[in-house]
């Protein structure tokens, strides 16, 4: 089975690790790559509630139940991180907030994949014909409920996060289009006085070369055409 752990890696705050179980008569040895609080919590809870472990399958089922509870616990923390990133994105869209969402999405992918594997393990144990009569039916129901709830919660959060990232991607794309429109509009408006000055500066008769008001007329025409350009672009909502 795979169990959830909180990681010290900032880029991957939550991940899942395999938990191996070796049974030898009445002894069970757990093997894990990382130290996890799930096992110690499981032992303390079992002793505190005076829970009697019937057999090896009963132990595996209770570990599946405990891991599902921890999945739900970490999913609540992931949901808080999603809300925090959403609040930060509402204030300003920066790469840090988007990267935080990508990291959370990666954690959810690990959770969903691991929960599917645990669900397969649960149903294989549940469908063992030789052990059906010995299973605690209440325990089977509890494991089924908690495991299904953890899977549904992880899928819901993943769908919400995917929709949120798609929405922010659309917002960023729309903002880029608006900026490009504004830059294009400004460039066109700035070209108007430049074009008029270039035409006036040509060495050809234009009727204003002898007038002492020629430069002022050109300035006035440039201002009027520029204002008209601004008005036209505003009507088209390019500003």
Predicted regions, residues:
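Peripheral, non-transmembrane regulatory/ligand-interaction domains of membrane transport proteins
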Residues: 1-134, 139-142, 146-153, 208, ...
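Hydrophobic alpha-helical transmembrane segments and their immediately adjacent juxtamembrane loops
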Residues: 148-239
